[in-house]
Swiss-Prot record:
Upper lineage: Eukaryota, Metazoa, Chordata, Craniata, Vertebrata
Alphabetical UniProt keywords: Activator, Chromatin regulator, Cytoplasm, Developmental protein, DNA-binding, Nucleus, Phosphoprotein, Transcription, Transcription regulation
Top-level taxon in the UniProt lineage: Eukaryota
Protein name per Swiss-Prot or TrEMBL: Hepatocyte nuclear factor 3-beta
Disruption phenotype: Embryonic lethal; absence of organized node and notochord formation, which leads to secondary defects in dorsal-ventral patterning of the neural tube. Mice deficient for Fox1a and deficient for Foxa2 in the endoderm from 8.5 dpc onwards do not show hepatic bud formation. Mice deficient for Fox1a and deficient for Foxa2 in the midbrain from 10.5 dpc onwards show almost complete loss of mDA neurons.
Start and end residues of each stretch annotated as Disordered: 268-366
């Protein structure tokens, strides 16, 4: 309908003087150059003859015009198509509304314009509104195009595929003393996994419940030489290797302590004996009491090396769940009691932090080859797999189990279910046959910057 409007040949330079400063809405200036505001003004003045039809026509035209402009219809419907009556009504009654409505949309230099020109510009106001929104549409389109990239980057903050028991076990096994307080467990998890830096109250409740309701975790009270708040948590010495070869994705079996009553009786005997006992010595005393027939005759600090070592050894050799419930006498024939010197040595190693880093654990649990001491009274038979790691080279050997960054292991979008051995998110893993280490061991650049100590150990 724009072709029906007669454009007279007035010079557009008269209106260009009003646009000396840069325009906020460049589309209005383009309309000024293309349509010619003088032509619109003269057309509006020429339409004054059509107002002779009476005020009813003008009011109808003004109402029609206001409804069009208020509804945000296209300017061709609002300013062009209704005809002379509607245009006159716009120039008369809707002119003031056009001036008021165009205030925030147009340059302030348009204020000296007459009512008719302001009304004509009011008819063009929807152009400015639509064009001012067009950059927003463009930005929205660009942001939608960028969304997949940001979503892909957020995979490093995805929820790790480990259970809370696995996370607690990781934290305890990497600590030098094999025991941590509750706050230290929280901090270790948040340092290693960015996902757990939010919604802390939820998952920390789950961590506390896992510590309380699983027999594989033991609460160790603070000793006088370690003042502070909160007790320590450690792994049960009889729980064995719950995670095969350091794979923390799934436990082999749930550790269930079936001798709670025997533990209480052993605790009473230990308190009456007057000597300190290790957290795991009570269970071994109960097993020794069943084997010998009298738990009260066993000294409080005395452990039978067979009773404490045989469940873990049998479990590592592929023993089934019935080995935990069976008495110690059913596993192997009884062996002679240890000498007092060996008892003191075992109690010292079980109670305190490691003082002999040169003593090696069993050979098939470590990638490095060391001499294995298979003597029945050696330190290997007196300690479980968790405590044996006290005597490994913490500061002189390379990391045996370095946890790997998600984005380097998982190779998204494959997810956690990728069939590669690196989906376990662990470093080198060796089995009993002495296979070569996984080639993913050297790539630990992400989390080593966060946590400089050895992050994970297989034993």
């Amino acid at each position: 309908m724009l072709g029906a409007v007669k454009m007279e040949g007035h010079e557009p330079s008269d209106w260009s003087s009003y646009y000396a400063e840069p325009e906020g809405y460049s589309s209005v200036s383009n309309m000024n150059a293309g349509l010619g505001m003088n032509g619109m003004n003269t057309y509006m003045s020429m339409s004054a003859a059509a107002m002779g039809g009476g005020s009813g026509n003008m009011s109808a035209g003004s109402m029609n015009m206001s409804s069009y402009v208020g509804a945000g219809m296209s300017p061709s419907l609002a300013g062009m198509s209704p005809g002379a009556g509607a245009m006159a009504g716009m120039s008369g009654s809707a002119g003031a509304a056009g001036v008021a409505g165009m205030g925030p949309h147009l340059s302030p230099s348009l204020s000296p314009l007459g009512g008719q020109a302001a009304g004509a510009m009011g008819g063009l106001a929807p152009y400015a509104n639509m064009n001012s929104m067009s950059p927003m549409y463009g930005q929205a389109g660009l942001s939608r195009a960028r969304d997949p990239k940001t979503y892909r980057r957020s995979y490093t903050h995805a929820k790790p595929p480990y259970s809370y028991i696995s996370l607690i076990t990781m934290a305890i096994q990497q600590s030098p003393n094999k025991m941590l307080t509750l706050s230290e467990i929280y901090q270790w998890i948040m340092d290693l996994f960015p996902f757990y830096r939010q919604n802390q109250q939820r998952w920390q409740n789950s961590i506390r419940h896992s510590l309380s309701f699983n027999d594989c975790f033991l609460k160790v009270p603070r000793s006088p030489d370690k003042p502070g708040k909160g007790s320590f948590w450690t792994l049960h010495p009889d729980s064995g290797n719950m995670f095969e070869n350091g794979c923390y994705l799934r436990r082999q079996k749930r550790f269930k302590c079936e001798k709670q009553l025997a533990l209480k009786e052993a605790a009473g005997a230990a308190s009456s004996g007057g000597k300190k006992t290790a957290p795991g010595s009570q269970a071994s005393q109960a097993q020794l009491g069943e084997a010998a027939g009298s738990a009260s005759e066993t000294p409080a600090g005395t452990e039978s090396p067979h009773s404490s070592a045989s469940p873990c050894q049998e479990h590592k050799r592929g023993g089934l769940s019935e080995l935990k419930g069976a008495p110690a006498s059913a596993l192997s024939p009884p062996e002679p009691a240890p000498s007092p010197g060996q008892q003191q040595q075992a109690a010292a190693h079980l109670l305190g932090p490691p003082h002999h880093p040169g003593l090696p654990p069993e050979a098939h649990l470590k990638p490095e080859h060391h001499y294995a001491f298979n003597h029945p009274f050696s330190i290997n038979n007196l300690m479980s797999s968790e405590q044996q790691h006290h005597h490994s080279h913490h500061h002189h050997q390379p990391h045996k189990m370095d946890l790997k960054a998600y984005e380097q292991v998982m190779h998204y979008p494959g997810g956690y279910g990728s069939p590669m051995p690196g989906s376990l998110a662990m470093g080198p893993v060796t089995n009993k046959a002495g296979l070569d280490a996984s080639p993913l061991a050297a790539d630990t650049s992400y989390y080593q910057g966060v946590y400089s100590r050895p992050i994970m150990n297989s034993s």
